[in-house]
């Protein structure tokens, strides 16, 4: 059997040669556990004559990855094999790689199709010695196997299907793409990115330094007008943004309801559903640049709209196709008045915005006055019990995990953009809360701080370093506003006037574990607050420094910050004594700030996978999960737990099987000591009341909002109602992003006879269940405290 080498020569397969290649990459690993010969044995079994050395390395890396559950060092080895494989394939020198990317000729049409911008290449070539020598290729070896594979699959630029960039090249391309001729700043950013202190968002990593640097993640729109022109102009904007791979939030509360009169045609409106089906098909058609994921639109509606019940059915799995729009995402923009009426079991009036205009343009007391005046004038189209609509909301969430829940009055009352007008919606991921109008499409550029990195070897938390890195991130995101490619002019106008940015986090759960704090402990709750105080403080200080150089953002005057009111003031919260807020407020009073909004913990799915961190602000969902690779799928264990169990001599095949049998929980495994059981509780074992409380405590330092998922293993209407009311009363802006549930571990098997139940019996069962659910919902509203105690 022979292999084909990289230069095309053939060579006989030699067991020892494969083993020695693997052995070379085992430096610093625990050789009591890691066995290169065992990997070689498995690799040989998968070989065929004529295999290339590239394929051989890929197989060796996958094989090492599958052995990760034996010892965590196998994961490091797997990544080293994969990275060294790429290093042999891709050129080393950064400036050479950038020239190759610029000189790319498209094989389909023979035309010059540069993959990086001429301006980027010129800067690289003019500073090539400094940039080339600043790169430290060993840092490529710090990715874990799955982080590296994610980069290779989606982030590193390819020439004719072959990866051309090394991870360090990509990070330097991004740094130069953002900072242009400011080489000192580019190298500072490169070092922080490559040492994993923070990461820019995926669109920034994909597109920085290219011909079309669309670096923003989020776009928010409100309907231009309740007319055919307005609806289709907005649709075109959505299509153009989606083509550039932006996630979209759209406010549709101003669109007239079903049956409303249309003066221009003397006809009647078909309402929201047919319009949203058109938006649904656009989302499917415009799939973020031709070969990526489908377009993603979140549709925001206020619950007084007459079409609200149909809106709640749009994502359901059953029902008539023409009444569904399953590719869209749905969110409620909820005024406090609705929550109050649900709580006190009052009536709720449904209206058409054409007959009752302006409800989406006001909030708080003004909204309540206008709404009550329309009720008095009898302009109402339908009256229902507020709890009947609440039941439909809970029913939809239990079935589909959505609609998202955002509280309109909190979003406006606690916004630094409230001087611009009423905010009408959030983003696709519920963390961006920005003003939109017919002339302005709100935009946000994102980055996330890797919170695990600031835990020192002495188990203390380095707040000073966190503040320093936050300041660099602010400067970067502020620069992106000016160099960004905007898919529509309204986005450019909005972003340059208000200059909002969104700094989020990843690895909060990892930071708690490294500090040895269980997620629900008092220590974790204090650290949670202090982390977000630090990020908010650092961000405000950096934005103030920028304002000192460049002046405050255009619409600063009249904003809460311009009056000395910061986010925590709007929550009536006093910060801890970690930072000198008095000094900062004096500085801001003198110079202002450059950015209207700063903090927005977003979901960090892809970038957290790259850096090997747990997502965002979330607890771990499981201590074991499955990963798929070409050669099959295998289990990965929470690396912190694996390390702890290995150190205590508790890690063996039987333990792995027990964790798998317990669906990733360790609570019922007798050999595991209590301190580890506390530390490694999964989200299903953590009180969601604590999760909501911690969200509110950090919320006082979050001037946008946060993507907050609620996890209830087996939701019932009572538990869910309790959760929502607790979150609302805590003052959250986003009460819920997704409702995450767990499929029953042993689904009940229906026998044929049971399926043949008479329809009558089935109907009575459904009615019984509805009564039970309603009772649970009402019970939780009437006995809030007791119900929360019995809820998760």
Swiss-Prot record:
DTTP binds at residues 226-228, 243, 256, 263-264. The record marks 737-738 as: Important for electron transfer. One of its GO terms (biological process) is deoxyribonucleotide biosynthetic process. The record marks 787, 790 as: Interacts with thioredoxin/glutaredoxin. Its EC number is 1.17.4.1. Keywords: Acetylation, Allosteric enzyme, ATP-binding, Cytoplasm, Deoxyribonucleotide synthesis, Disulfide bond, Nucleotide-binding, Oxidoreductase, Phosphoprotein. It is an enzyme of class 1 (oxidoreductase). The modification Phosphothreonine is found at residue 751. Gene3D superfamilies: 3.20.70.20. Under complex allosteric control mediated by deoxynucleoside triphosphates and ATP binding to separate specificity and activation sites on the M1 subunit. The type of nucleotide bound at the specificity site determines substrate preference. It seems probable that ATP makes the enzyme reduce CDP and UDP, dGTP favors ADP reduction and dTTP favors GDP reduction. Stimulated by ATP and inhibited by dATP binding to the activity site, the dATP inhibition is mediated by AHCYL1 which stabilizes dATP in the site. InterPro entries: ATP-cone_dom, NrdE_NrdA_C, RNR_lg_C, RNR_lsu_N, RNR_R1-su_N, Rrm1. GO terms for molecular function: ATP binding; ribonucleoside-diphosphate reductase activity, thioredoxin disulfide as acceptor. It is found in: Cytoplasm. The record marks 218, 444 as: Important for hydrogen atom transfer. Residues 1-92 form the ATP-cone domain. The active site is at residues 427, 429, 431. It catalyses: a 2'-deoxyribonucleoside 5'-diphosphate + [thioredoxin]-disulfide + H2O = a ribonucleoside 5'-diphosphate + [thioredoxin]-dithiol. Provides the precursors necessary for DNA synthesis. Catalyzes the biosynthesis of deoxyribonucleotides from the corresponding ribonucleotides. Heterodimer of a large and a small subunit. Interacts with RRM2B. Interacts with AHCYL1 which inhibits its activity. NCBIfam families: NrdE_NrdA. Two distinct regulatory sites have been defined: the specificity site, which controls substrate specificity, and the activity site which regulates overall catalytic activity. A substrate-binding catalytic site, located on M1, is formed only in the presence of the second subunit M2. This is Ribonucleoside-diphosphate reductase large subunit. It comes from Pongo abelii. The gene is RRM1.
